[in-house]
Design a protein with these regions (language model features):
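Non-catalytic substrate-recognition and accessory regions of acyl/acetyltransferase enzymes
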Residues: 1-6, 103
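Active-site segment of metal-dependent pyrophosphate-handling enzymes
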Residues: 20-24, 66-70, 78-115, 123, ...
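NUDIX/MutT-family hydrolases
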Residues: 116-154, 163-176
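Short helix-coil junctions and helix-kink-helix linkers
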Residues: 175-183
Length: 183
């Protein structure tokens, strides 16, 4: 251990000023052939126990934001291997009633599969975008921003292909793009 590291060892996680917690939230889109859907988890703990939210949670001290997002997604839904993209950071001071929390939001497009609530999520379920219930925290705002980002992104990148089977028809592709652009 270097002399500098030895000198700083006692300072680990000691701060003069209060600091916020950091979380991640994952907006996961799927397509059932007709409608665009979003994956939600039912919160099993306060605050907002029983309300629907995006998979997510607090970062561990030894992980990156992306690692934390993927860990929470797996723990709360069983979903693994999603290619997630960061799209926005939400930092309103009162967004979480427990404490000052900043969340880094990710979105992903995945082939719909069976999911199951785990960890602090009592359930996990796919919802059509026009059937999303009122969400916990500021997740309604996060969903609107994710939809807007996806609609913009689809004009520049072939992002929709992750939602289609390996072999698909032009009609399936058209249905997908219409579903995304009409959200």
């Amino acid at each position: 251990m270097s002399e500098e590291n030895k000198a700083n060892e006692g300072l680990k996680y000691s701060y003069k000023y209060p600091h916020p917690s950091v979380t991640t939230d994952c907006v996961i889109f799927g397509f059932d052939g007709v409608k665009l859907k979003v994956l939600l988890v039912e919160r099993g703990m306060a605050p907002y126990k029983g309300r629907w939210a995006f998979p997510g949670g607090f970062l561990n001290m030894d992980e990156s934001a992306e690692e934390g997002a993927l860990r929470e997604l797996k723990e709360e839904t069983g979903l693994e291997g999603a290619y997630i993209r960061q799209f926005h950071t939400f930092s309103a001071p009162q967004r979480d009633p427990r404490e000052r929390v900043i969340t880094i939001a990710y979105y992903a497009l995945v082939t719909m599969q069976e999911v199951k609530g785990g960890d602090d999520a009592s359930d996990a379920r796919w919802f059509a975008l026009d059937e999303v219930p009122p969400l916990a925290f500021d997740h309604d705002q996060i969903l609107r921003k994710a939809e807007k980002t996806l609609r913009q992104q689809i004009h520049f990148e072939p992002v929709g292909f992750e939602l289609l089977p390996e072999k698909f028809t032009i009609k399936q592709l058209q249905n997908l793009y219409e579903a995304i652009l009409d959200m």
